[in-house]
Amino acid sequence: MIKENFIKIYEESFKENWALPALTDYGKSKTFTFGDVATEIARIHLLFHECQVRRGDKIALIGKDSSRWCIAYMAVVTYGAIIVPILQDFNPNDVHHIINHSESVFLFVSDRIWDSLEEDKIEEVRGVFSLSDYRCLHQRDGENIQKLMKSLDEKMTEKYPDGFTQEDIKYAELDNDKVVEINYTSGTTGFSKGVMLTGNNLAGNVTYARTLDL
């Protein structure tokens, strides 16, 4: 059992490093500070709350490495949902299978990969969001996610009238023995198999990395 709580590691890091640079995409001038990342996560958490996403719901994520990929990942796990990262090299049939097999309710995806997928093959997905700007690319019939997205700035202002600050960071209380990620293998024998990872698994990697002189 790892002493440090996986979710609390994020919470403490954002608070302690608020003004420091956190993420920059290669070849881009835009840099997200830890505070920027925490604020983006708060927006996504508000979206999840308004859409009644529950703790333990699965949310799929596929795209090349980017700042917004990282932010989406962190937003899911710190909300208490389970992230399902999918290799961007998987073919569309494998992607459809993983999304359905994992019972993912939302999908964050790059625009290029979304163009290769078929909506009618992931019918249980309630909403699909672009990794370029988090706009809603698709919503299931009966959902009002696109309308909700238009009012998200207003809802953020209502919830945080003085702006989102370090003091507002409060993430899910989740024991390290809970599953936080389902990681699918490359599927060398048939379709991919899902490996369940707990907070202990990931906290162990983080705490070890902190001991390195990088």
Per-region residue spans from a language model:
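Conserved ATP-dependent adenylate/AMP-binding module captured primarily in the ANL superfamily
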Residues: 88-120, 205-214
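Short beta-strand elements of ligand-binding domains
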Residues: 63, 86-87, 126-136
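Short hydrophobic alpha-helices that are characteristic scaffold elements of the AMP-binding
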Residues: 74-79, 101
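Conserved AMP-binding/adenylate-forming core of the ANL superfamily
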Residues: 2, 22-66, 70, 74, ...
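Conserved pre-ATP/AMP-binding loop-to-beta segment of ANL
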Residues: 18-19, 147-184, 191, 214
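Conserved AMP-binding A3 loop
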Residues: 33-35, 171-172, 180-206
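Conserved S/T- and glycine-rich ATP-binding loop of Class I adenylate-forming
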Residues: 59, 76, 107, 179, ...
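A short N-terminal helical cap/helix-turn-helix that marks the beginning
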Residues: 1-22, 39
